[in-house]
């Protein structure tokens, strides 16, 4: 299996990443940044989000495993103290695959497409925005206000909740 590691950049995360790299090589895995099948994210949720955006064009080809060394770890699978357990699972157990929906936002005015695991926000503190909102190319509504926040199920507990939005069960297929 080919793998790569994205870490948060602090000394502790780098140390955990190096330990993980050595242990994975010891069980016969190949470290390969270019053709990875598994990406290990060592840090917190922000590190995982960065890793997802780094590999956004290959999401259907790779899987992510997150190791928590950061501040927030809602998406992390293992803690930094469980690296040996992780390597054991990689070698001996069938992994449980958990899929998360990504939110795609097309911005035709600037010819850009954005993807989000948590939420997409469009906001202005300086003036009122008037937004025409479409879902799957079908007009939904016009919105006038300081902005809009659209979240996925996993993002419903983040900024959306702080904005008094509903928390959505991850098993539901809704925004």
Regions found by a protein language model. Name each.
Residues 72-147:
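Catalytic core of DAGKc-family lipid kinases
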Residues 44-47, 70-72, 154-157:
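Short glycine-rich anion-binding loops that position phosphate/pyrophosphate groups of nucleotides
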Residues 35-36, 59-62, 111-112, 144-146, ...:
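Short coil/turn connectors at secondary-structure junctions
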Residues 55-62, 80-86, 163-173:
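A glycine- and small-aliphatic-rich helix-loop capping segment at beta-alpha/alpha-beta transitions
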Residues 141-175:
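Gly/Ser/Thr-rich active-site loops/lids in small-molecule metabolic enzymes
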Residues 1-42, 49-57, 79-98, 106-113:
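ATP/NTP phosphate-donor binding region
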Residues 60-76:
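Short, acidic/small-residue loops that bind anionic groups at enzyme active sites
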